[in-house]
Amino acid sequence: VTGYSQGGAVALGVTRMIEENYHQENEWSVRKLYAGAGPYDPAGTYLFSMERNEMGIPAAIPLIVMGLNDAYDLGFTLDEFFLEPLLSNYEDWVGSKEYTVGQINQLMGSTIMSELMTEDALTLDSPQADMLYEVLLWNSNVGYDLQAPAYFLHSLEDEVVPLLNSINLEEQMPDKEEKTFDFDYYGSHMEASVPFVQYVYQDL
């Protein structure tokens, strides 16, 4: 199972699902997991982005907030989380599904959290932010006891997915046997995908 960026987090999640639900019945098994620069720790990323007041992929903000709102029926309203111009244009930019993530990033016009989200959304003591944080914790794979051999790569220069995702994953992984964590200067988030793919190709 392999994936990079969001695909890396999905690859880990799929591996976990297989191990927890299908492995014992010998229906499916994972020979090896390859995951690069994934947002494995969404709650940690939320806190990190609030502290820095910046989000590498601003489009992730409405996609994550309202995606979780719909999935868990949290009752969030747009004005509890978003400022203009995102607030008035959410249905067009995001709800219509007519725009790519890159286009939504451009339309939002900023990577500064305080220019995109309300004060309550950026204050963990508020009911909205507290609930969002709890749901992000539910969706984390950090701390999962991964059984399959695995290779994780993350560039120390990654400007999109914070390195803390991979660091927290490594530090809280119960069994590190046959797990390789490759943290090095591989360039930007996009540039680091090249050595990741090269490693996967050579290892296979």
Task: Indicate where each model-derived feature is located.
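Accessory cap/linker subdomain of secreted extracellular hydrolases
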Residues: 36-143
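Loop/turn elements at helix/coil->beta-strand transitions in domains of secreted/extracellular proteins
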Residues: 27-32, 146-149, 175-179
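Short beta-strand/loop motif that positions the catalytic acidic residue
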Residues: 146, 151-158
